[in-house]
Structure formats: structure tokens, C-alpha cells
Amino acid sequence: MKLFKRISLVLGVVLCVFLMTACGEKNVEGTPEELMTKMYADFKEDELPMLDQIEVNEENIEYYLGDASIEFESALASEPMISSIAHSVVLVRTKDGADIEGIKTKIKEKVNPRKWLCVGVEKEDVIVENRGNLIVLIMVQDETTREKLKTAFNNL
């Protein structure tokens, strides 16, 4: 009986260690440009507006993320060339040791989902998620496109 308890204890510890290491989310490798290209890879040309990629910097961060105090390593926005279409995807690579949950909350609370002329996205349709130190902000009017982008991000 003692042997069974010891074996059970050892197996339990091994299982816990395995689960704890499996749950640690790894950072997604690649430049913002490479990752953005992967996110859009499964879209047909006629499914999307004509998009432009814009580097997010201290001059335009408030427009894209809602708050100039967000610190990041790199960020890239994908937006339509015609501003009458509600479509914005922003990838943000945070600095090492950043409070990712805090940054996500700040983005979700402060970003303007009605920043375009005449169109917008409902606040509840704003998606802010992360994989490791990579955060995505998705504000897209079309639900199918929005969900497809979310899935593409989660599959990076």
C-alpha cells in the first residue's frame, strides 16, 4: 500500500510539472509585418478592403491604441486606404516583463471604436487578445471577418 501511495505521489508531481510547463504561453516569433501577412493569408482579395500597413509610433499611438502611455517594443496597424470602412487590426509586441493584462485592459477601455468617418464598431465587438507578449486589437465591422482574424491570430 505504501508503494502505491509513493508511485501515485510521484506520478502526481510529474503530471503537475508537465501541466505547468505546458500552460506557459510562448512568445510568437516573427516581425509584425510577417505576422500580419500570416493573419491575412487565408483571405481572398475580395473579402477585404484595400489595406495599408502603418507602423505605430509615439505620434500615432493614441489613434491606433487609444492611449499614448502604452509602452511597447514594436507595433503595426492594418487599416483600409479608404476611411469609410470600419476595419483596424493592430499587432503590439510588448516589452519584456510588461503587464500584458494591464495593457490589454487599457487598450480595450480607451481605444475609439468609432474613429472612422461615418462608421464604427460596437464596443462589445472590439477584440483584444494576446499570445505571449504579442497583443492583437481587432476592430472590424463584419463579424465573419472579425472572427476569422481572431482565429488566424490564435493560430500564429
Per-region residue spans from a language model:
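Bacterial N-terminal signal peptides that target proteins for export
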Residues: 1-11
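Soluble, non-membrane globular domain cores that form compact, hydrophobic packing
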Residues: 6, 23-156
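Gram-negative bacterial Sec-dependent N-terminal signal peptides
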Residues: 13-15
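C-terminal motif of bacterial Sec signal peptides marking the signal peptidase cleavage site
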Residues: 18-22
